Amino acid sequence: MRPDTSRDPVAGPDSGPEPPFPIRLAGPVIKGFGRGSKELGIPTANIPADGLAEYPDLQVGVYYGVVALNPAQSEVPSTSAQILPAVLSIGYNPFYKNTTRSIEIHIMPPLTAPSPTATGTPGHVTFHKLPDFYGTSLKLLILGYIRPEYDYVSAEALIEDIRVDCEVARRSLQRGAYVRYLGAGADENEENEEVQEQRRWLTTF
């Protein structure tokens, strides 16, 4: 059960990702359990979990990072050739008692756009939604860990915690050492080679 404590406003050090991050995962967007969007109102893009075999020590929980969709496959114009912020869960979702580990990614709007999850009351939160893009190749770069998985007393409590996760992810990615992975915040000549290489990987399909 989720502890009754206040949430930290950001996750990860201000200096930038530390090992094991960044973590690369990729795969086609597949159908999940269908509950994120239908029951919770939180659209997610699921990718196969077999890529986690390379990271056997990665704990289950909620993470943040950046994603890119193959523009040749995606019919979502706003994502074409873009790297977008994301919050994701890796694990079993104790609230639904899943027995199969999954990777569920919620793609957020660009950091320059207003945040749909900045405010809200339980049960009345609006999350960013894109048209379905099943089968589209997706690349994910995980940059930090937010919190463990928890069980919840209600769906409303789960939704509120995910809303806060989105805001923690946004604030974390707005910091200088992280926003560069989105292609913002610095002149390319001033960026280190590692960040440039990660961005090239994200956008090369």
Curated annotation (Swiss-Prot):
Positions of region (Disordered): 1-24
Give the enzyme's EC designation.
Answer: 2.7.1.26
> Which Pfam family is an annotated match for this chain, by its short name?
Flavokinase
UniProt record similarity statement: Belongs to the flavokinase family.
- Function field: Catalyzes the phosphorylation of riboflavin (vitamin B2) to form flavin mononucleotide (FMN) coenzyme.
Cofactor entry: Zn(2+); Mg(2+)
What species is this protein from? Aspergillus terreus (strain NIH 2624 / FGSC A1156)
* Stored SMART domains: Flavokinase
- Protein name, entry field: Riboflavin kinase
Against InterPro entries, the record matches this protein to: Riboflavin_kinase (IPR023468), Riboflavin_kinase_bac/euk (IPR015865), Riboflavin_kinase_dom_sf (IPR023465)
Q: What class of enzyme is it?
A: transferase
Active site, per annotation: E104
> Coding gene?
fmn1
Where does the chain bind Mg(2+)? T44, N46
| UniProt entry keywords in alphabetical sequence | ATP-binding, Flavoprotein, FMN, Kinase, Magnesium, Metal-binding, Nucleotide-binding, Transferase, Zinc
Q: What is the lineage of its organism?
A: Eukaryota, Fungi, Dikarya, Ascomycota, Pezizomycotina
Provide the catalytic activity annotation.
riboflavin + ATP = FMN + ADP + H(+)
- Coiled-coil positions are none
